[in-house]
Each structure stands twice: as structure tokens, then as C-alpha cells.
């Protein structure tokens, strides 16, 4: 039944007027149970019909297990926004650590050279060197051990990828 509903939604999206329709949001929980092989084209094409597709899964390994690793990578690339909560498997954490990007940092090294005071002209020289280092923004361990209700989020705004950052869930009080 879930696949039928998803195929019906896909059909409805493709009937929309490209680039001029209002935005529509499709949310699919536990989506590995409902997807089908051509789903990868749907997530790419849905953008021009202004359909936003949000999916949730326990692990991306479900995709690789069912359809293969390349299919999984194709889907992950097609989904432009990514949100990862803690307590994921180390395998998923490694994958998302790479997907969420890298950052450059610079390490300073200092050296000193001293000419013995017993020489005619004792001298002390010091210098600094800088080395560029590229590292993942969030290591697998930082992804796994995030604070409760904290998520690593990477989004695209106006076709520009925004670097990953960690956000805290802001729940609506029960009184509301």
C-alpha cells in the first residue's frame, strides 16, 4: 500500500506545472520500506515541480542492503538536505561524516635555533611555519555521541550549500 501511495504522489507531482506551482512537501517515514528502483529519478525531478521530499530511516544500510551501495549513494546525493541524530551505527557515522563536508585549518609550528654563547657572536633565531590541514567537520564519534535531541544539519539555500552545523530540537510546549 505504501508503494502505491508513493507512486500516486509521484504521478501527481509530474502533473504539476514545472517551476510555477506552489511548493508541496512530501514526508516519507521509514522510506526504505516503500521506495522502488526508479525512485532515484523522482527525487531529482521533483525539484523542478517544486516538490520537497523529506525522508526518514533508521539506517542507510537498509538502502544498500536492498538496492546496492551505488543506489544508496545516488539517493543520498539527490537528497539535498541532510539531518542526522546521534546514536547511529559507526558505518552510518563514517558515511555522513564524509558527506557533511570538510574544513581547512592551519597549524602553527615554532622553531628556535640558538648559537652557543661560547661562540664569538651568540645568536638566537626563532621562526614560525604554518601548515594547512583538511579535516572532516564532524567526526564519526561526534555524530554518534551528539547531545540528546541534537542533530547535525546540512541544507541548501537558494542552490547554495550551507556548511553543516549542529542544532537543538525546540519542542512546542504541551500547553500549546
Show the residue positions of the predicted features.
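Conserved P-loop NTPase motor cores
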Residues: 1-127, 166-173
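Conserved P-loop NTPase motor module
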Residues: 108-176
